[in-house]
From Swiss-Prot:
Coiled-coil portions: none
Cellular component, GO, one term: T=3 icosahedral viral capsid
Keywords recorded for this protein, A-Z: Capsid protein, T=3 icosahedral capsid protein, Virion
InterPro entries xref list: Tymo_coat (IPR000574), Viral_coat (IPR029053)
Gene Ontology molecular function: structural molecule activity
Subcellular location: Virion
Major subcellular site: virion
Function: Self-assembles to form a T=3 icosahedral capsid composed of 180 copies of the capsid protein. The capsid encapsulates the single-stranded RNA genome.
Organism: Eggplant mosaic virus
Name recorded for this polypeptide: Capsid protein
UniProt similarity note: Belongs to the tymoviruses capsid protein family.
Length: 188
């Protein structure tokens, strides 16, 4: 029986949490915690250089649209190889950075914590790989009364394959939980 466990690969990080506005002394608004997941990009057909900012990701802004405050409580990126990866192996470079980082996807291996993973082929992994967001090195407040420039951003890169696949050989999903509070007053 094949082991189908997801492999976790924590990214080394520098302890530099983001700052945010302190809560007021008044009673806090009620809050809910919602899960989210979205496909960030695919690999294998062409060169892929992706920069995914969580504060402006469509799936998150839809959930956040009815609230004034949104905090990220959990987050990870999962690279999932497809069956096409066996015949068309690929290497993916990935790193979590803050939104205001000037690093480009092609420079991932020059960023502290940047890693390279190979999927497919005869001997390499075809299991999903999860890279948790190092919450201690970014500002997890995605929406507030002010804009923050140090929210999480995922950089991912895969070079153009020597024999491009017609279908993706891997995808990246970003998933986690959001704490939404202070509902916005809306017209019915």
């Amino acid at each position: 029986m094949e082991d189908t466990a997801i492999i976790r690969s924590p990214q080394p990080s520098i302890n530099a949490p983001g700052f945010h506005l302190p809560p007021t002394d008044s009673q806090q608004s009620s809050a809910i915690e919602l899960p989210f997941q979205f496909q960030a990009t695919t690999f294998g057909a062409t060169e892929t250089a992706a920069q995914i900012s969580l504060a402006s990701a469509n799936a998150i802004t839809k959930l956040a649209s009815l609230y004034r405050h949104v905090r990220l409580t959990q987050c990870a990126a999962t690279i999932t190889p497809t069956a096409a990866a066996i015949a068309n192996p690929l290497t993916v470079n990935i790193v979590w950075v803050s939104d205001n980082s000037t690093a480009k996807p092609t420079e991932i291996l020059n960023v502290f914590g940047g890693s390279s993973y190979t999927f497919g082929g005869a001997l390499n992994a075809t299991k999903p790989l999860t890279i948790p967001l190092p919450m201690n090195s970014v500002n997890c407040m995605l929406k507030d009364s002010v804009l923050y420039t140090d929210c999480p951003k995922l950089l991912a890169y895969s070079a153009a394959p020597s024999s491009p696949s017609k279908t993706p050989t891997a995808t990246i999903q970003i998933h986690g939980k959001l704490r939404l509070s202070s509902p916005l007053l809306q017209a019915n």
